[in-house]
A protein has these predicted regions:
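Short loop/turn segments immediately following beta-strands, especially the blade-tip
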Residues: 4-14, 73-82, 128-136, 185-193
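Surface-exposed loop and turn segments in beta-propeller and other repeat-based domains
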Residues: 15-40, 86-96, 139-151
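Signature of short aromatic-glycine-proline-rich micro-motifs recurring in repeat-based ectodomains
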Residues: 35-49, 97-103, 152-159
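Residue-level detector of Asp-centered blade-edge/turn motifs that repeat once per structural unit
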Residues: 52-53, 107-108, 162-163
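Residue-level marker for isolated small/hydroxyl-bearing positions within beta-strands
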Residues: 60-62, 115, 170
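Short glycine/acidic-enriched loop and turn motifs that connect beta-strands
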Residues: 63-66, 118-121, 173-178
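Blade-level signature of beta-propeller repeat domains, shared across WD40, Kelch, NHL, RCC1
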Residues: 161, 165-193
């Protein structure tokens, strides 16, 4: 379903716009790299993400035997009536997840994060893509199991702030306890796996900060060097004088 908001980010102003038709049909489910959906299986859409330009839509599908991420093309941005399955893309999640509940992309579209819970496992899986919002090539970086956190029961949605240095997980308690949103601080943006921190050049804000720091350092060095050189020149000019304290 698509809803339009007359005031940005204000759900009280939303109105129904459109929806997909027969998302369970082979046209929208079969033929991609993510493998086909068996007709006798459950097939639950558990997460939806859209590329920054509105030209791609991704759906996280959970089923009995294999969970998938399907990639769709929107020939008109954000228009669900123009949606078509991208056959050369898609991810078969295989054994990496067992009960995926939520999905989120990094700001630049080069990583996907999946919240998953099954039994005592409460995991977030990180996947790196070969291109921005392109699931045709990918690498599963790994997962973080949060079973030691007693406040977590069933992970649901996942989100990040714009800088990617904070991660948010929605938690659903089945029988008792309060449903919560948990906040986590990350060492580097959009990364939860050791050794997989993205390069600074992947983030224009971080790049700008580093460039500014380098420029400040260069100016400081230039100023210090100029001061020292000017002092030496003065000493040379006045080397025959007895008093050089000035």
């Amino acid at each position: 379903y698509r809803f339009d908001l007359s005031v940005p980010f204000d759900v009280s102003t939303c109105s129904y716009a459109q929806r997909t038709t027969d998302l369970d049909s082979p046209t929208y489910q079969n033929g991609s790299q993510a493998l086909d959906h068996a007709t006798h299986e459950d097939n639950h859409p558990q997460g939806v993400s859209i590329s920054n330009d509105g030209k791609k839509l991704f759906i996280l599908m959970e089923s009995n035997t294999h969970d998938r991420i399907l990639e769709y093309k929107l020939s008109t941005p954000y228009d669900l009536t123009t949606m078509s399955l991208v056959l050369s893309a898609g991810i078969n999640l295989g054994s990496h997840v067992a009960n995926p509940m939520g999905m989120e992309f990094s700001e630049n579209g080069k990583r996907i994060f999946i919240a998953d819970h099954h039994g005592s496992h409460k995991e977030v899986t990180q996947i790196s893509l070969g291109g921005e919002f392109d699931t045709s090539t990918f690498t599963v970086d790994g997962e973080v199991n949060m079973k030691t956190l007693s406040d977590l029961d069933q992970l649901r949605p996942i989100a990040f702030n714009k800088s990617g240095l904070k991660m948010y997980l929605g938690n659903d308690w089945t029988d008792s306890g309060d449903d919560m949103v948990h906040e986590f601080d990350l060492v580097c943006p959009f990364n939860i796996i050791e050794g997989k921190c993205p390069p600074i050049t992947d983030n224009k804000d971080r790049t700008a900060m580093v460039e500014a720091q380098i420029e400040i350092a260069k100016r400081t060095i230039d100023h210090s060097t100029d001061t020292a050189l000017n002092r030496l020149k003065w000493i040379r000019r006045n080397k025959d004088k007895q008093n050089l304290t000035n």
